[in-house]
């Protein structure tokens, strides 16, 4: 968050909406109010400048609020109550994309910053959505962990579908 491109130690206090961060560059401390009680934190590099932006998803309204590191705020409606935010770079443009997993129907709704809307059916209502670049191609992949079986289901962007047994059922 301090513009040196290294990860900073940070916590968010939901009761007050304050982000507390310890700067990796100089050990300094920042306290910035951004968000409200009930929000879910969704940090990422939404503007592609290489610096993490503070961001929250407000499930009650389906709105995303992004405090851009270079200044300014982005507000975007995307999602609904009950959705789980799964922000990541799904289109490989080095910008975090707004995305939600909807447990009620197992759909992933992804708004790619260059690719637009993508909808993917992948998961069950009891699955835990997971993002990551599981095939190392620079594009985020969609995956779910199924607690009832301890199995990971991964739909990689270039490597295709695979499963992995890792975890306790």
Segments (PLM) and residue ranges:
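Trp/Gly-enriched beta-strand/coil motifs that build multi-repeat beta-propeller-like domains
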Residues: 1-169
């Amino acid at each position: 968050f301090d513009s040196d491109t290294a990860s900073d130690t940070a916590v968010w206090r939901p009761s007050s909406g304050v982000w507390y961060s310890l700067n990796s560059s100089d050990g300094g401390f920042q306290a910035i109010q951004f968000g409200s009680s009930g929000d879910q934190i969704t940090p990422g590099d939404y503007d592609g400048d290489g610096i993490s932006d503070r961001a929250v998803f407000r499930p009650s309204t389906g709105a995303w609020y992004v405090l851009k590191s270079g200044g300014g705020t982005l507000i975007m409606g995307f999602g609904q109550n009950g959705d789980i935010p799964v922000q990541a770079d799904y289109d490989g443009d080095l910008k975090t994309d707004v995305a939600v997993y909807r447990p009620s129907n197992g759909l992933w709704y992804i708004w790619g910053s260059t690719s637009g809307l993508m909808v993917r059916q992948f998961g069950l209502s009891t699955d835990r959505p997971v993002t990551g670049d599981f095939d190392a191609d620079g594009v985020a992949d969609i995956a779910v962990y199924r607690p009832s079986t301890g199995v990971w289901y991964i739909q990689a962007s270039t490597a295709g579908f695979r499963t992995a047994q890792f975890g306790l059922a």
